[in-house]
Amino acid sequence: MPTSMLWAVDLFGRVYTLSTAGQYWELCKDVQLEFKRVSAATQCCWGIACDNQVYLYVCSSDVPIRHREEAYENQRWNPMGGFCEKLLPSDRWSWSDVSGLQHRPLDGVALPSPYWEWESDWYVDENFGGEPTEKGGWTYAMDFPATYTRDKKWNSCVRRRKWIRYRRYKSRDTWAKIPSKDDPKELPDPFNDLSVGGWEITEEPVGRLSVWAVSLQGKVWYRENVSHPNPEGSSWSLVDTPGEVVQISCGPHDLIWATLWEGQALVREGICRNNPKGNSWSIVEPPGSENGIMHVSAGVSVVWAITKDRKVWFRRGVNSHNPCGTSWIEMVGEMTMVNVGLNDQVWGISCEDRAVYFRQGVTPSELSGKTWKAIVVGRESDRSHSGSSSSLLSAGCFFGEEVRGSGTESAPSDTDASSEVERQGPERSLPKESLDNSRNLKGSSSKGHESTRNTEDPMENACLAEGQAKAPKTSGPDECHGPAPTPAELPWTNIDLKEPKKASNQPAAGFPETSGLSSLGLFPMGMEEPYGADDHPLWAWVSGGGCAVEAGSALKWFTVQSGLSPSVQTLSLSITPAQTAAWRKQIFQQLTERTKRELESFRHYEQAVEQSVWVKTGALQWWCDWKPHKWVDVRVALEQFTGHDGARDSILFIYYVVHEEKKYLHVFLNEVTVLVPVLNEAKHSFALYTPERTRQRWPVRLAATTEQDMNDWLTLLSLSCCESRKVHGRPSLQAIWSVTCKGDIFVSEPSPDLEAHEHLLPCDQMFWRQMGGHLRIIEANSRGVVWGIGYDHTAWVYTGGYGGGCFQGLASSTSNIYTQSDVKSVYIYENQRWNPVTGYTSRGLPTDRYMWSDVTGLQECTKAGTKPPSLQWTWVSDWYVDFSVLGGTDQEGWQYASDFPASYHGYKTMKDFVRRRCWARKCKLVTSGPWLEVAPIALSDVSIIPESADANGRGHNIALWAVSDKGDVLCRLGVSELNPAGSSWLHVGTDQPFASVSIGACYQVWAVARDGSAFYRGSVSPSQPAGDCWYHIPSPPKQKLTQVSVGQTSVYALDENGNLWYRAGITPSYPQGSSWEHVSNNVRKVSVGPLDQVWVIANKVQGSHGLSRGTVCRRMGVQPREPKGQGWDYGIGGGWDHISVRANATRAPRNMSRDQEAHGPGPVCC
């Protein structure tokens, strides 16, 4: 789970953040402002300061926020002077936008606010539809509203060119004031409340936010055009309400609730993709007539509320179809406010002790949770206090008395112990008023939502005889600490508290004064702390809109050891998990060596049993190879025997019945090349391949009744195959990695003769074993760095382990295995045909496709009948319309065409008689494997530099390039064998979004844009990892490229039609090459290795018995003088979707024949 932030404001207006992986509240970097309340999203936070102005805090990121400004220069031809700026009176402006309706001179385009800066000056865009234009960037047409082309024709009477300029948002990690322009709609009064949400509105474009605000006059305002490229938005618009609003809350989806002065709640209805502001309000009555609602918080499927008597309420039956819900349920506890974050997790601030509480037990099946638990972590400034007290460990009375004192008490609860540890210490710096209040509160108790108890500090008991003042410690939400007034004395809007005075810094009685103790009363930069060193902060507001906490996740906010002082706690925390893991590994290594020494003395004894046999039997289903092709019940037996030399081998027997005659089929597991799970909605099945069955494209398919049974058999058979081939442990540095269309990861160890020119090993004899995890793309390097990308664009890095998933605990490493999740979408299509009576309906012709089908129209797929890809996946969303399909859509998501097998477009014409609409639904898989997440940027492609075995690059960092899901090109810094995840991203500017990137062995970087154009990055080197500029490379004629792969000297590219192209003419003096040469068709993915070897995933391969889709293929005959090769060698398939051979730098033995010697030396880096 990636780290995220919980935001909070204390009573003094200071903004703090708490990481889900942290144990301290960190003060916001910009401390000049004091805030009343904040509302957070994933990448930003909005707030209302004490000056009643709205501010925006955008978190820093390696990827900048860039916005492209465009202007078009228009010219018309005349017989006197040719093309000039003199236009006809009916023409558009000489400088305009793309439509020509708006005047847009270059000097008239200004920055929207002081928080933006220009990246460069205006320059001409010489890219037109993926093809480079002539010098000057002009495109020509017969008239302005016509279609433009790159080439000038005899009837080209007008021309235009596009000027572009990028601006960058520079206000990161600081509060930026939202500008208020002088216009008639300027705010009449200051803001009182603000809420951010709506980033997951169904069908909403990624990055859009909904910002709602309430003024002191009770009016509701909406911020227009807030999105990731435009974080400030454009303007405020007034939203009519039936009454005066006090407070408003916007959930991540389409829930918006507000509270009225009269105590009722307002619910906004009609929110959708095309209308994020909604269209009407509905009134919801409060739980009781005596106490109205004063605070609400909306989530994804929940709404929580606080009434005027501080009671907490949960709204039942809330969802997108019924935003008003059904009824109120009273919850335990009294809060001043609550906030619902991501995944419907809830935080609140207690009205008694002003502490932040987290609602535990919130799950999709139990949205109300189970209990409140206090967050007991301290502030980051408290680290020096707890750390300096560690020097007192040498004082015997301190450590001994504390242990004796703690032993006389009963074990406290987690919350009590955490609060007690947080407030203990060898020196008290509480103000005198606070100590007096503590004495007055001694022995008192109040009614609350959780059981509380009073405990005394054992440290103070030990030092009471020395004259140290004893202050009883209180904990729990029902006790008040420090100068906090009672709830009745707290104003709702204006909080004006005086800072408590500091107590004099004197050393504790009985302890020598040390530098560590004296530092407890000092604060950095002369800044006074509003709390004592042992006080917990008093909170006024909390926001979890950007805090992602999954149900059941272990947080460090509550796990503080009970009965230990801060000094002992600091000591225990100083032992890092890495040190603990190293200590365990050392013990394991010593035990292993001892076992070897003890067994060495008995090796000369003869074995008592020369040969052993082990058999496992079970019942499975087998897909019959002959008619009628169907699943039949069979008995299977795995017989494993150990030979005289200790080698193990296994045979799998499949017993079946044909026409009442018993027969069997046997497979030697040392001949099995791969065991692969099969994507099946209704069966837990897997396939077994041998070299012969790989050539036939007809594997042995088996199915189990349960997923656990299938995993058991799959694990056992895979382990037996690995033992037969003596393959164990983590993959080698030269391993070949691949991914199936199901997301399963497979790895193969290359033999020395795999890339030999003579007597090479056929691909169908390669042995593949499965690794735990789930990925869509994988990329490897010969120095052991392996990265992968999931279906949800999450980046993962290989940890060095092996196994995981179904192999956990049996054929898996004990360390470096972590939980991994992935999310993908399932798509179905709604088809309709037009008729003159009723228009478009779901009644088609008898020859038409199904009205609910897949993308091909050949298979019927309804909403109710469509299931997740396999039983391992679970639905995590409802069906929604997908507006991002190729060709565009109208406002309702429809695409139109003349007939179903034709091309679709997003607008209706007179000849369009059919239409379709794409529906999507997300599903999630949770597994485990040797992978760690690389946060926080989502990626769509990644490339690691391939290095040959004799390359002298061990001293340099490993070059890694990637493309984000938004199309940004990134370069990863700090990647090495010891740190495969790297340290940070370096953004590489582009003029358009990219789709693919690849770096070669000599730091030659090639990339493909989303419009199909190719680019080469110049001057990339270890000292200049990002290079200097992009060179536009013309694509193959009438083709749009989708992927590129670069080896040592070879560059291969793939177009959208499955054609494979080779870039010819690449030399050290001209690394861009001269032309594209066609190599093959029927290709889905390509991977070029450090030896310029070429491997692909073929779309279709015909075998002797069947057809396979997605087959691993190797290009044969690739040599320095024949870089394109001469044919294909077909390997494992089908169902494979990605392969990476960029780690395989294993050269063939040097028994070169005369023919090989005639080819001359190897390739030279460009």
Swiss-Prot record:
TECPR repeats lie at residues 209-240, 254-285, 301-332, 344-376, 734-761, 958-989, 1003-1034, 1049-1080, 1092-1132. One of its GO terms (cellular component) is autophagosome membrane. The PH domain mediates the binding to phosphatidylinositol-3-phosphate (PtdIns(3)P). Its main location: membrane. It is found in: Cytoplasmic vesicle, Autophagosome membrane; Lysosome membrane. Residues 407-418, 437-446 have a biased composition (Polar residues). Residues 403-492, 1147-1166 are annotated as: Disordered. The keyword Repeat applies. Residues 420-436, 447-456 have a biased composition (Basic and acidic residues). CDD domains: PH1_TECPR1. GO terms for molecular function: phosphatidylinositol-3-phosphate binding. Tethering factor involved in autophagy. Involved in autophagosome maturation by promoting the autophagosome fusion with lysosomes: acts by associating with both the ATG5-ATG12 conjugate and phosphatidylinositol-3-phosphate (PtdIns(3)P) present at the surface of autophagosomes. Also involved in selective autophagy against bacterial pathogens, by being required for phagophore/preautophagosomal structure biogenesis and maturation. Residues 616-722 form the PH domain. The modification Phosphoserine is found at S386, S388, S391, S413, S418, S943. Interacts with ATG5; the interaction is direct. Interacts with WIPI2. Interacts with the ATG5-ATG12 conjugate, the interaction is however mutually exclusive with ATG16, since it does not interact with ATG12-ATG5-ATG16 complex. Belongs to the TECPR1 family. The keyword Cytoplasm does not apply. Keywords: Autophagy, Cytoplasmic vesicle, Lipid-binding, Lysosome, Membrane, Phosphoprotein, Repeat. This is Tectonin beta-propeller repeat-containing protein 1. Coiled coil: none annotated. GO terms for biological process: autophagosome maturation; autophagy; macroautophagy; regulation of autophagosome maturation.
